[in-house]
């Protein structure tokens, strides 16, 4: 079954985030071209994205994974720095650094070769973490799904580099 913007908005409501009808229409549904959006994908709403800063609300459904990627330098800028703040549910963020011996979640088995960073950061509501520019990372929601506020420098998603060559 396909994902609807109304379903995404129900997660925002669980987190106490109110979007207008026009904003709900602007929710973006991403499957990264892999065709398995409930397993690998991301839903988001962009409040603002200027040449100085960006603010988004991300939704991940239960067990849904945003694939490994990094935000490289672009046009003389060092790459996007982003802070994630968990608003609802639980999100497991994996970044460069010392490998977590027993990660709490794993990416989809069929895609595992495209995941190379394993330093685990567990975010619950109120928890936040800042990802430095040009740092490989991926994340997955826990059993309830997750809502995450992203605050960052300018977002130029078309320049993101994914570890998976299919994306």
UniProtKB/Swiss-Prot annotation:
Looking at the record's lineage, which domain of life comes first? Bacteria
Decide whether keyword Metal-binding is in the record: yes
Say which enzyme class the record assigns: isomerase
Cofactor(s) recorded in Swiss-Prot or TrEMBL: Mn(2+)
One GO MF term, please? metal ion binding
SUPFAM superfamilies the record matches = RmlC-like cupins (SSF51182)
Catalysed reaction, written as an equation: D-lyxose = D-xylulose
- Keyword Glycoprotein assigned to the entry: answer is no
Q: What is its EC number?
A: 5.3.1.15
Q: Which UniProt keywords apply?
A: Carbohydrate metabolism, Isomerase, Manganese, Metal-binding
Positions of Mn(2+) binding: 69, 71, 82, 137
Disulfide pairs?
none
Q: What does the similarity note say? A: Belongs to the D-lyxose ketol-isomerase family.
- Function according to Swiss-Prot or TrEMBL: Sugar isomerase that catalyzes the reversible isomerization of D-lyxose to D-xylulose.
Tell me the subunit arrangement. Answer: Homodimer.
Query: This protein is called what?
Result: Probable D-lyxose ketol-isomerase
Q: Which species expresses this protein natively?
A: Bacillus subtilis (strain 168)
* Name of the gene encoding the protein in the UniProt record: ydaE
């Amino acid at each position: 079954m396909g994902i609807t913007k109304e379903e995404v908005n129900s997660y925002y409501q669980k987190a106490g985030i109110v979007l207008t009808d026009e904003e709900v229409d602007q929710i973006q549904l991403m499957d990264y071209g892999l065709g398995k959006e409930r397993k690998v994908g991301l839903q988001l709403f962009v409040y603002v994205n200027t040449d100085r800063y960006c603010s988004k609300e991300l939704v991940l459904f239960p067990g849904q994974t945003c694939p490994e990627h990094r935000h490289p330098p672009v046009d003389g800028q060092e790459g996007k720095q982003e802070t994630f703040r968990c608003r609802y549910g639980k999100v497991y963020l994996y970044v460069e650094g010392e490998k977590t011996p027993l990660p709490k979640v794993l990416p989809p088995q069929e895609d595992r070769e495209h995941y190379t960073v394993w330093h685990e950061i567990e975010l619950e509501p109120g928890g936040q973490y800042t990802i430095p520019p040009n740092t490989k990372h991926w994340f997955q929601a826990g059993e309830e799904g997750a809502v995450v506020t992203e605050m960052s420098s300018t977002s130029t998603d078309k320049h993101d580099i994914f570890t998976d060559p299919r994306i």
